[in-house]
């Protein structure tokens, strides 16, 4: 399945979650798009709820179905709770960490920064958004990319960095200190529904 490339605003309103991370999509119209959006009261089936939750998380991270399912399967082979492991793996992706450090205003921008080669891990350029970080690894912006407006503006307005990360705004240097705990990740996602979806 290809990555969704339509309107993130409409998709955010349909799923009830901000896919950009800014929350602007839901400020004025916190309901589904379309003529009947404000009055939609359709009750979803159990399968519908599971599917919607899966789509929310997949679109949030901008992943193809194959990438998403592969990560889910990897999480299932780890010790611990499958759903929580899955959420932690997603949050440990390089593009997700670049976004969480405040180097990009949206997750899509973070994917682009990584994909275009603006980011280094432990001093080596990494252009794979799905690159999985390990505790202790250092994320930096390449020297020739540090004056990009998109990065400077993002860092300037960002006022929160999760506790599992460390960030020096002056040097644009971040450290993946540890794996996040579930409580530090998106609370609007019910990952158990996703586990149930793939267990059908």
Curated annotation (Swiss-Prot):
Residues in the signal sequence: none
GO biological process, one term: translation
Keywords, alphabetical: Ribonucleoprotein, Ribosomal protein, RNA-binding, rRNA-binding
Quaternary state and interactors: Part of the 30S ribosomal subunit. Contacts protein S5. The interaction surface between S4 and S5 is involved in control of translational fidelity.
Role, per record: One of the primary rRNA binding proteins, it binds directly to 16S rRNA where it nucleates assembly of the body of the 30S subunit.
Family from the record: Belongs to the universal ribosomal protein uS4 family.
Protein name, per record: Small ribosomal subunit protein uS4
UniProt organism field: Staphylococcus haemolyticus (strain JCSC1435)
